[in-house]
Structures are given as C-alpha cells and as structure tokens.
Amino acid sequence: SADVAGAVIDGAGLGFDVLKTVLEALGNVKRKIAVGIDNESGKTWTAMNTYFRSGTSDIVLPHKVAHGKALLYNGQKNRGPVATGVVGVIAYSMSDGNTLAVLFSVPYDYNWYSNWWNVRVYKGQKRADQRMYEELYYHRSPFRGDNGWHSRGLGYGLKSRGFMNSSGHAILEIHVTKA
C-alpha cells in the first residue's frame, strides 16, 4: 500500500484509516504521531525541513506535493528510556513564494501538557526552527488536540481545517484549501 509515511497520495483519500496505518507502522512507541496534510491550495508545495523540539522521524518529508495531493509524515519520541514526547514544525515552500508551517506537539507527560497543533502561512521562505516553534506554540493561538475539528483563515487566499486526537498515539489531519 502507498499509505506510508513519506508518500504523497490523492488528497481525497486522506482520512483517519490512512493515518492509523501510518501510525501502526511505527510499532510499539509510547509517543508517536501520524500527520496528513491535504493540498487543495491551488499551489505546489516543496519540502523545506522539519524542526524537532523533541523526538525524531526516520522519514524524509515528501519533496513535492501538487494541488490535489496529500503528504503523509510521522514522528516518534526518541528511542530508549527518555521522558520526551514528539514535538516539531514542518515547513513547505509554496509556489507563490510563501511558507506553509505546521506545528505538532505530543507531550510525554499528560499531567502537565496536552496535544497541540497549529498551521500558519509565513510571508516569504522561512525554514522551521526554534523561533517558529515558539511562535506557533505560544503566541499564534494553537489548537488543542481535543478530538474535534477546527478551522481558521490563513490569509493569502487560504484557509485550513484540521483534527487532532488527544492520545499519545496521535493523528493530525489538516486540509489547506482556497478561502
């Protein structure tokens, strides 16, 4: 099946079943995430980078994501007996010259933290880094991973709709569409 992290699939095929398949491929890991981002923006996206605040991925970001396609990606806590989650930001350059950034946060300790996610368009090309992480996590009204759908205008003629569950085995599904 092509429903593996690092693949690009038809956007219409993105859903919970696909993301569960991506998640299960990570095996028995306490904190992990499957990410699916559907490109209905009318633009082509080119991978820039992933910045991990904690955790890692063995997957290379899909390089090109055409309009009508969706990228699949995953992340997991660092291997070994370390008390970390998987927290990071994905950055894609869009064919209009701007950057699509997606934050995901799956904490280790649910007594203190919750799942969070965010999506934003930055003017110009910006690689994901610590500053972008801090802005998306602390200052740009992130959404809680609360098992519900959330929508937001992104500017630049775009809007987003996304869902994240509250589990340590997290799924994050985002659709970026024309406004």
UniProtKB/Swiss-Prot annotation:
Binding site for an N-(acyl)-sphingosylphosphocholine 5: S114, R144
Effect of F16 to A/G/P: Loss of pore formation ability in cholesterol-rich membranes, but no change in pore formation on membranes with low cholesterol content
Keyword entries, A-Z: Cytolysis, Ion transport, Lipid-binding, Membrane, Nematocyst, Secreted, Target cell membrane, Target membrane, Toxin, Transmembrane, Transport
Spans annotated as N-terminal alpha-helix that contributes to the pore: 1-29
GO CC entries: extracellular region; nematocyst; other organism cell membrane; pore complex
Residues noted as binding an N-(acyl)-sphingosylphosphocholine 4 in the record, renumbered to the chain: Y133, Y138
Residues reported to bind N-acetyl-D-glucosamine 6-sulfate: Y51, R53, Y138
Site entry: Part of the hydrophobic cavity (in subunit A) that receives Val-60 from the adjacent subunit (B): F16, W149, F163
GO terms of molecular function: channel activity; identical protein binding; lipid binding; toxin activity
Residues with site note (Protrudes from one subunit (B) and inserts into the hydrophobic cavity from the adjacent subunit (A)): V60
Positions with a binding annotation for an N-(acyl)-sphingosylphosphocholine 1: R31, R79, G168
Family: Belongs to the actinoporin family. Sea anemone subfamily.
Described function: Pore-forming toxin (PFT) that consists of a crown-shaped octamer or nonamer that forms cation-selective hydrophilic pores of about 1.5 nm (inside) and 13 nm (outside). It causes cardiac stimulation and cytolysis (EC(50)=1.6 nM on erythrocytes). Interestingly, the Phe-16 is crucial for hemolysis.
Additional information: This protein has been found to bind carbohydrates, since it shows a substantial delay in elution profile in size-exclusion chromatography. The carbohydrate pocket ovelaps with the lipid-binding module of actinoporins.
Domain-related comment: Composed of a long N-terminal alpha-helix and a core region rich in beta-sheet structures. Before the pore formation, the alpha-helix binds the lipid membrane, partitions into the lipid-water interface and stabilizes the monomeric molecule on the membrane. Finally, it traverses the bilayer, thus forming the transmembrane pore.
Protein name (database record): DELTA-actitoxin-Afr1a
Species this protein is from: Actinia fragacea (Strawberry anemone)
